[in-house]
Regions:
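Hydrophobic packing residues within well-ordered alpha-helices of enzyme cores
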Residues: 40, 56, 129-130
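N-terminal FAD cofactor-binding segment of flavoenzymes
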Residues: 47-48
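Short acidic/histidine-rich motifs immediately flanking catalytic phosphotransfer sites
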Residues: 74-78, 110-113
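Rossmann-like NAD(P)(H) cofactor-binding subdomain of soluble oxidoreductases
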Residues: 87-137
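Short, well-ordered coil/turn residues at beta-beta hairpins
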Residues: 75, 81-83, 118-119
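A structural signal for isolated positions on well-ordered beta-strands in alpha/beta enzyme cores
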Residues: 6, 28, 64, 114-116
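NAD(P)+-binding Rossmann beta1-loop-alpha1 motif at the extreme N-terminus of oxidoreductases
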Residues: 1-44
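A structured beta-alpha segment of the ubiquitous adenosine-cofactor-binding alpha/beta core
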Residues: 52-77
């Protein structure tokens, strides 16, 4: 049974996940960059990757990109979070603000989607997020 999957982030990880999942599911790819969104919707890869380009050209994909995160998350069964978490070696710190923002938006729209984090996060992040939001769907 096909699922509706929202993928947050159209970088290498997010675009790869969205492309593969779109073979058998309805995928809504979310990004803040209108250029990336337009490229995906026109079946052009916004990143240079031989396999993604090949899939775009040769495969039937149920893949649509948008900058409207709220609408995408609202209808999703799953939300794959693949947004940047830059590491600052001087502070020994991962900037998880983009991950937190996606989680907050999913909760704000009332989605019951299972959230899957593919971004690099520090040890204990998921447990802390579950405790903070009172929900095990992360």
């Amino acid at each position: 049974m096909n699922k509706t999957i929202a993928v947050a982030g159209l970088g290498y990880v997010g675009l790869s996940m969205a492309t593969l999942l779109a073979q058998n599911n309805h995928v809504l790819a979310v990004d803040v960059s209108k250029e990336r969104v337009d490229a995906v919707n026109n079946r052009r890869s916004p990143i240079r990757d031989e396999y993604i380009e090949k899939f775009f050209a040769e495969r039937t994909l149920d893949l649509h990109a948008t900058t409207d995160a709220r609408t995408a998350y609202e209808s999703a069964d799953f939300v794959v979070i693949a947004v940047p978490t830059n590491y600052d070696p001087k502070k020994n710190f991962f900037d998880t603000s983009a991950v937190n923002s996606v989680i907050e938006t999913v909760l704000q729209v009332g989605s019951q989607a299972q959230m899957i984090i593919k971004s690099t996060i520090p040890v204990g992040f998921v447990a802390a997020a579950r405790e903070e939001i009172g929900r095990a769907h992360v």
